Amino acid sequence: MQIKSAKFYLSSQKEKDCPKTIMPEYAFIGRSNVGKSSLINMITNQNKLAKTSSTPGKTQLINHFLINNSWHIVDLPGYGYAKTSKSNKKHFQKSITDYFKHRKQLASAFILIDLRHSPLKIDLDFILWLATNKIPFSIIFTKIDKLTKTEIDNKLLNYKKELEKNWEILPEIFLSSSKKHRGKEDILNYIDKINQSII
């Protein structure tokens, strides 16, 4: 799939304030500083569509981007940022859970995980929560340019072993590097395949 147009559409604090459209949506979420905004910019051929920052927890709203005038990318607040206040954590958690539980336009979620790290409970718990609530999702492992091929293979194997504790069939998995533009085609082809079945 080719991205012919990509533009900011709307920022919302709550799920009920999100766009009232019937277009399919693909939500991108992960721990703070996982490279989410950089990935969105990479797959949309934009440099500044999603605001990037070295400060974790920068994304604090539900941000919709209109792609090819037919579907949305949704940039969700990152989870697990320790320096966020308790009240903000509670607000972010509610806005995220409300979005996933009630947003009928959601076609699939993409969970972003920094492959440099060992499997973390916060990521595994969130993945399990999505599965328990029957929310379709895939996993994108980010920042693979920081690893050797052997390190990628070993770390990917560790994650698969953890996931296999709860699943016989693993979710779709993508490897990406925004810096090296890796994974873009696979992710867009996957989205296109889903779009073809519902648009």
Where are these regions (language model features)?
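Canonical P-loop GTPase G-domain recognition
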Residues: 3-15, 146-199
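Helical mechanochemical/support elements of P-loop NTPase systems and associated helical scaffolds
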Residues: 48, 61, 72, 88, ...
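Conserved nucleotide-binding/hydrolysis micro-motifs of P-loop NTPases
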Residues: 58, 71, 78-81, 116-118, ...
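Conserved nucleotide-sensing/catalytic segment adjacent to the nucleotide-binding pocket
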Residues: 68-106
